[in-house]
Every structure is written in structure tokens, then in C-alpha cells.
From Swiss-Prot:
SUPFAM superfamilies: DNA breaking-rejoining enzymes. The lineage of its organism: Bacteria, Pseudomonadati, Pseudomonadota, Betaproteobacteria, Neisseriales. HAMAP family: Recomb_XerC_XerD. Pfam families: Phage_int_SAM_1, Phage_integrase. This is Tyrosine recombinase XerC. Residues 114-294 form the Tyr recombinase domain. Site-specific tyrosine recombinase, which acts by catalyzing the cutting and rejoining of the recombining DNA molecules. The XerC-XerD complex is essential to convert dimers of the bacterial chromosome into monomers to permit their segregation at cell division. It also contributes to the segregational stability of plasmids. GO terms for cellular component: cytoplasm.
Amino acid sequence: MVLDGFAAYFDAYLENIVREGKSEHTVAAYRRDLEELFALLAQMPSEDAGGVPQDLSRRDFTAALRRLSQRGLDGRTLARKLSAWRQYCAWLVKRGLMRADPTADIKPPKQPERVPKALPQEWLNRMLDLPVDGGDPLAVRDHALFELMYGSGLRVSEIHGLNADDVYLDEAWVHVTGKGRKQRQVPLTGKSVEALKNYLPLRQTASDGKALFTGRNGTRLSQRQIQKRLESWAAQYGDGRHVSPHMMRHSYAGHLLQASRDIRAVQELLGHSSLSTTQIYTKLDFDHIARLYDEAHPRAKRQDE
């Protein structure tokens, strides 16, 4: 049975990526994707899946992908799962437990390019400039959280992981631990500094006292709690539009890129390893870019001007 061979090193692999510093979220995702693969391979006829890692072929993995596709999974999800499988196979090959990686030449399903949704700048300014009840610690906390979310473009996981000593208000920057434990420094807006100065004296602290954003009991806000606070705020004061932490980050990236035209700087601020990841934000507002072109390019001006 393939699980006796291919899956025999599963626990050792997970222990290895934990040692490499992968986040709990990433490790859990790899675990789910690989356990799903093992289950799919176990369901295949014996002639389709071998008993030891060397017996596995490209056909086994394409068959597993095909079954997942038949369940209605989209291309992006299938590509992510294939990536997890490929990394496990590469780890086995590196340790001499497989002769070759059978996933190496499998192309991930083609994914339609998705342009991120950005919130209107005027709407965000209006929402963030709403009066804050200084006597309500949670309202003061949420205002600081939302200012930081839009003002510095942090991922919800990064905000969740912030400690109070990661924030340097006098210098107006924040120390962020991003994907893959990568460290970066991100500037704080004047509005964020002001909101954090109002919040920090009211902050509830648990025994260790490290977390920047905490609940009533002083414990660190979870990613889900942060998301729900944002949704509640938008529902209460907004116009009914859906708002998520991811949209706040997209808005930061798009608005900053429109103003600066410096894609490399935006890449650094967002913590993107690849410039191609940042380039999708160049498609956020083609009308805005077209207007800049009309105003700036000498050949774009009308003859009667």
C-alpha cells in the first residue's frame, strides 16, 4: 500500500519544516494537503499507485489532481495543493528516499488572473475620520487597529503577531514579522501614530503583556477576531459594502502605487518576495493610469490644446 511507503516520512517532514521556521498556519495547511493526497492515493487501484516512494509516477499525481478537480476545486486551490505535494517529494529526493520527483514536470492548472478589489480612498478616509469614543477602550483599540491596517498595509496574520515593543512611535515605524519569518520595517502614518498613542495607555495585558492588540481579558486578538471587528465596524458605520483585512491591504498597495509610481518600494513595504506578486496592483485602476498618461505624455495631448 502506498501509504506504507510514501507517507512513512510524513511526520519527519513536518518536524523539519517546523524547525525551518514555518508558521503554524503553513504547517497545518501542508498537513491537510498531504493527508488528502495520501487518502487519494490509497483509493487508487494497486496498479495505479506503488507501494514505496520509488513506485509512484507522474500518473499517480495527475490522477489525484483530476479527482480533486472533479470535486469542483478551482485552479488556485489545485495549484496550492500541487505545490505542497511537490515540496514533500523534493524533500524525499534530497534525502535519497525517492530517485526522482514525479511531480517535477506537472504544470499547475491555469489560473485566471484576479485583480484585487480596492476600497475607494474617499470612503476609507471618511470611515477612519469618524469620531471615536475615547471612553470606550475597545473603540479606541479598533480605531488604532484599522489605522494601522490601512496605513501600513499589514497582513492580518502580521497584525495578530505584533507585540507592543514592535512599535516605535517616536521614529514612526513598526517591526513586522511576515511570511516565512521574514523581518521588515514599515513606516507608520501620522494618523496611525496618533491612534496608537491613544490606545496604548488603555491596552489590557495578560500575564506576559506582550501582545499589541488584546481583548477584554488581556489576551492576544486572534486573526478571526480582528476580521470580525473590521466587518462589524464597516457594517455599523459604512454603506453595506463588504470589507476584509485583505481588501484593506489591497487598498494600501493600490493607493500607494498610484501616488508614488514606485513598484519596488511598494514591494518592500508589502513584504513580497517576488516583484510579480506586486505587479498585480498595477491593474487596480487603469482609468487613473490612463488619465496620468493623457496629462503627461506629449503625444497624448489634443492638437487644439
